[in-house]
Amino acid sequence: MTESERKQIIALIQREVIPAIGCTEPIAVALCVAKATETLGAKPEKIKVLLSANILKNAMGVGIPGTGMIGLPIAVALGALIGKSDYQLEVLKDSTPEAVEEGKKLIDEKRICISLKEDITEKLYIEVTCEAGGEQATAIISGGHTTFVYVAKGDEVLLNKQQTSGEEEEEETLELTLRKVYDFALTAPLDEIRFILETARLNKKAAEQSFQGDYGHALGKMLRGTYEHKIMGDSVFSHILSYTSAACDARMAGAMIPVMSNSGSGNQGISATLPVVVYAEENGKSEEELIRALMMSHLTVIYIKQSLGRLSALCGCVVAATGSSCGITWLMGGSYKQVAFAVQNMIANLTGMICDGAKPSCALKVTTGVSTAVLSAVMAMENRCVTSVEGIIDEDVDQSIRNLTRIGSQGMNETDRVVLDIMTHKGC
């Protein structure tokens, strides 16, 4: 691997693995509102928000940090009132109870209009127009949770990258394979990749804070109970499940707790991190081993998401848990061959799990994902692998990954439409 390629990979990871407070879809909407408000230069009197179906789906049922409220309107209001676009996915970290009350007024006065953007193919699309005193400003995020492609004040266009984006092109030219991910994780100079330890610190802290409260379905806390230990044991496996689900519990309930995200998703960051951290700590692994296993996990997720896309009908925890399965397999003493086996086993098992939006029950799916990650790693270490005569699995692991992402990005589009239709027509 050339030094230039190594630096490209490190830059890619540093772009994709970043802190986030709250579910990233409503937070990305708040970020877009903050940018439009800053461009307007005044407190908006009216805010119009147009969203792709996938953003709408992921923002409907999730808690917004520091508000005790669920859904988009309060995220939009706070984006306008206290949001700072420089904070990126931590845009609402300056929220106060007073701001929340003021935000409720904006909602009650019907100053916020949120609707579906029709006839677009981009699954991650946010368009915000803010108006005040006869003036208006527009901001558009597209393709990535923090990727602004258009900003304008009145007729003055300040940014227009709607046709081409240099950064997006640069990302696409970096072609990863599972072998390349594995080699990078094991050979990159330690000091160049040590930064990945921040994922362990931040996400473990989120889980530990969650154990102290009663967030969402409190799945993580429940898994530490006496009754649960009688059934599942007090083991590395049960600890992996409890820590990972606890961090997800807190996030989906809207706790003001930062986590390290991956590819625009906090739950993906949690699922790629905590199983690896818990396994490493409870098996006495060195700091270097933890760093390399975390790097393998996170870069595997980034690699799979390159062809899947930011948002899809496929639950992101399937992808993220595949990363942690790789990291755990390597920590168990696995070779590249066994890491590839773990990936094949994951794809054979979990492909097709739907995403029906971000919400407290995501903790259940995360737990399913990471329990399968451990199972897949254990199978791989016994040299057991789902074969290419079975279903969607190919002899070549990279082709199996492409099969997974093709199902998620193409095959499940109708599923996505039906899921959103069901969610928007429920009698609740």
From Swiss-Prot:
Which chain regions cross the lipid bilayer?
A: none
* One GO MF term attached to the UniProt entry: L-cysteine desulfhydrase activity
InterPro entries, A to Z: Ser_deHydtase-like_asu (IPR005130), UPF0597 (IPR021144)
Q: Which GO terms describe its biological process?
A: L-cysteine catabolic process to pyruvate
- Which PANTHER family does this one have? UPF0597 PROTEIN YHAM
Q: Which family does it belong to?
A: Belongs to the UPF0597 family.
Q: What is this protein called?
A: UPF0597 protein BF3772
Native organism is Bacteroides fragilis (strain YCH46)
